[in-house]
Every structure is written in C-alpha cells, then in structure tokens.
C-alpha cells in the first residue's frame, strides 16, 4: 500500500504541475465526441464532420466512456482514471516479476514501477501510452499465469490484452507477435504441444476479431484495405510527402530535430539554423538546402515540386554515404529514443544540452537521463540472470527496436512500451544472488 500511495501521489503531482491537453489529446477527444454525439468516427472542420481513419478506435472508445461518465471533454477526469490504470499496471508488473523470479523481485518491481516518473508523467496527458502500458502489463501477467496453470480464461484475457493494445496503437500488435509463439515454445515442455498450440492459435485469432469491423468500415467508407492505421496518419487522398520524409531520414536523430524540422513540414516555417551539421555534405549541398528552405518558406507548404526537390536531395545524400543512411542514423535514432532525458512532457528546452542558455534545465535533464540509465542498467543485470521467459521478453524488445529503427522521426515515448518488461527485469536485479535460482530459457 505504501508503494501504491507513493505512486498515486507522484501521478497526482504530475497532473497538477504538468497537465497537457493540447495537440493529439484534442484530436482523440474530437473523434470521441463526434462518435458519441453524431455516430460519425471523424474529425470536425469548418465544412462539418468528415470520417477519418488516422487514429485507431481504442483510445477514442476509452474517452467516450469517460465523457459519458464524467462529462463531455472533462479531461481531468480522464487523467485521474489513467492514474488508476497505471497503478494497476504496477501491480500486474509486480505479479509478473514474482512469477518469473521471487516475491522479493516482485516487491522491487512494484516500487520501481510506482516511483518511475517517466511512465507516471504520461497519466497527465490524454494519450494512448498509459492504457498501452496497462495492456502490456496485463498481457505479461496473464502469459505467466497461463503457463503456470493453462486455463482457458487466461487465453481470453490475453486475447483482450493483445487486441486492445493494437486498437490503441498499431505497434501494439507486436505484443501478440512476440507472446503467441512463446506460449507454444514454453508451454509445450510443461503441458504438451497439442494443448498449447490450440491455446496459442485461439489467442491469436481472437485478438484479430476486433479488427474485422474496423477493416470493413474503412473499406466501406474509404474503399481502402486498412486493418490498422496509416503510417503517416493521413486519410486516403491526403499527401504523404515521401520526398520530405526520405530527406528527414538522412538528417534527424533526436527529438529536437523531430520537433523543429519534421513536425513543421507543411505546417510552419523551416529554419536552416535548426539543422545539425550532418545535414550538409558539402558547401554546394548547404546552398541547395538553403534555397530549398527559402522556396518552401514562401508558403510553408510542401508542394509536389518542393517534395520532388527534397527527394532529389535525399537521393544525393544517400549516394554520398549509404552506410550513414542505412545503419548509422537508424542506430543513432534508436539510441536517442532509449537514452535521451525523458523530459518531453516537462517544460524543459528541447536542446537540453545547451548549458549556457539554461544551466538549471540542463542539470535537471542530465539527472533525468542518469535515472533513465539506472533503470536500463538494472534491467540488463536482471536479464543477465536470465529469469523465466527472458527469451519472450527479449524477443519483444528486439522486435520493437527493429520497428523503431525504420522511423525517420524519433520520440523517446516510443520505447516506453518496453518499460513493463524493464521494471520486472530490474526487480530481478534486486534479488539476492545467493537465493536466486538460475532458470532455463
């Protein structure tokens, strides 16, 4: 109870000090409101409400329920509801750590999860992350329980966790991709191949069922096959700017570049001074980029002609250094998502490393980065001890890293979905080594 009380206090403080409802929360809220009041899964505009598929229905469904219970657009109530889900996630992670190691590891995981400011901070903004973490935690606990006692009710709980995780975010589908085969891999040794195969297949098939009506709706409304959500969050017929995106992938490695360059594309001015030195391979390329930015800034619109010029510039840069494009920059983006100070929801400068401009914020960000690193190191120690189901945990993390390496615009929140596993493994690190039983894969 002390851990949960401390965790609740931390989350309430974030809601009081750093609430955030601008941007994506309002997009989700608009969809939920139109869905509830008008029966249209869509966004509002000057011309009325138009259907959309840029967001999956999992989080708007949650907001609809909150709006019905607590009042329309009562986002504070949404945040406090998310606190309850996040604390439940802490308990589920603790239960999972106890199952893969010991009671001591479970207690350690509970405290680590409850007092983690990185996950707690996301309860203060109406976004998918808190519910996604809950689904992952529920899946981990149900997975371990199913392999201890293979009852069909845990198959149904797992299927719910898999499907709702994917209904919240398309990358949530990785949970089923990692754990469904693991049911067979681990369970066949204990309970026989036949039963575990039936359970794994049933779980996988049930987790797909909610996407049937969503896919049919998208086909009926937009005449496209879209079982998840589009990569670039665009409705059919809207431009995706492949040239600009490809050029961005030759430049961006951190959140500052994502914010100042990628998100400003087609919405705001682009400033050459915001680009890092790696954006130019030669003085001629610097001049070419400057001219391209100047032409774009005349209207702040990526026209087909502007996009084609970005594509040519990207092709030139890839030809100059293919290793940088295909290996070095993806690895750098991945490292930034894991190691960057997780201050994206705090009122901290994006360029946190510029000490002369804001020394106090730089020092705070460095401390935040050190805390993040401590969690990662503890998790690595726990993984080294190789508790039960470590293979499944590692498979999920590696699958997620492989997916994130394909992104052109890194954000630290994309690695947050690995934190339930990190909490459990870090809990194992606090186990007494003399008491720890090193278990097989």
Regions found by a protein language model. Give the residues of each.
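Extracytosolic helix-loop segments that constitute the early lumenal/periplasmic catalytic or substrate-binding loops
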Residues: 9-14, 26-51, 58-61, 65-66
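Multi-pass, polyprenyl lipid-linked donor-dependent membrane glycosyltransferases
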Residues: 23-26, 54, 77-85, 108-143, ...
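Loop-to-helix entry region of an early transmembrane alpha helix in multi-pass inner-membrane enzymes
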Residues: 57, 61, 69-91, 110, ...
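Transmembrane-helix motifs of polytopic, lipid-linked glycan transferases
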Residues: 80-101, 138, 142, 377-381
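Membrane-interface transmembrane helices that cradle and orient dolichyl/undecaprenyl
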Residues: 103, 139-155, 184-190, 430-433
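Membrane-proximal stem/loop segments at transmembrane-domain junctions that anchor or position
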Residues: 227-343
């Amino acid at each position: 109870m002390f851990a949960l009380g401390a965790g609740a206090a931390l989350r309430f403080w974030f809601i009081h000090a750093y609430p955030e409802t601008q941007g994506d929360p309002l997009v989700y809220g608009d969809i939920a409101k139109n869905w509830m009041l008008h029966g249209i899964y869509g966004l509002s505009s000057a011309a009325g409400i138009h259907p959309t598929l840029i967001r999956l229905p999992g989080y708007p469904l949650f907001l609809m329920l909150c709006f019905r219970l607590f009042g329309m657009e009562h986002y504070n109530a949404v945040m406090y509801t998310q606190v309850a889900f996040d604390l439940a996630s802490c308990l589920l992670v603790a239960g999972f750590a106890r199952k893969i190691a010991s009671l001591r590891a479970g207690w350690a995981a509970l405290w680590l999860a409850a007092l983690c400011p990185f996950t707690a901070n996301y309860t203060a903004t109406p976004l998918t992350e808190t519910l996604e973490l809950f689904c992952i935690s529920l899946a981990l606990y149900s997975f371990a329980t199913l392999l201890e006692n293979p009852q069909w009710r845990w198959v149904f709980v797992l299927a719910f966790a898999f499907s709702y995780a994917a209904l919240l975010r398309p990358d949530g589908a990785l949970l089923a991709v990692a754990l469904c085969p693991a049911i067979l891999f681990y369970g066949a040794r204990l309970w026989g191949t036949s039963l575990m195969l039936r359970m794994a297949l049933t779980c996988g098939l049930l987790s797909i069922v909610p996407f049937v009506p969503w896919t049919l709706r998208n086909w009926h409304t937009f005449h496209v096959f879209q079982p998840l959500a589009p990569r670039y969050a665009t409705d059919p017929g809207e431009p995706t700017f492949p040239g600009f995106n490809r050029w961005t992938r030759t430049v961006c490695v951190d959140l500052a570049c994502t914010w100042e360059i990628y998100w400003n594309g087609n919405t705001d001015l682009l400033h050459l001074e915001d680009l890092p030195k790696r954006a130019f391979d030669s003085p001629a390329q610097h001049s070419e980029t400057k001219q391209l930015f100047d032409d774009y800034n005349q209207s702040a619109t990526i026209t087909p002609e502007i996009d084609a010029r970005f594509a040519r510039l990207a092709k030139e840069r890839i030809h100059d250094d293919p290793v940088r494009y295909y290996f070095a920059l993806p690895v750098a983006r991945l490292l930034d998502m894991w190691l960057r100070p997780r201050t994206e929801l705090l009122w901290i400068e994006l360029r946190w490393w510029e000490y002369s401009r804001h020394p106090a914020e730089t020092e705070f960000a460095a401390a935040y980065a050190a805390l993040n690193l401590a969690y990662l190191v503890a998790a690595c120690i726990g993984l080294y001890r190789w508790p039960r189901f470590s293979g499944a945990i590692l498979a999920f993390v590696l699958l997620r890293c492989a997916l994130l390496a394909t992104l052109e615009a890194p954000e630290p929140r994309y690695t947050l979905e690995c934190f339930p596993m990190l909490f459990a493994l870090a809990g194992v690190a606090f186990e007494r080594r003399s008491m720890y039983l090193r278990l097989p894969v």
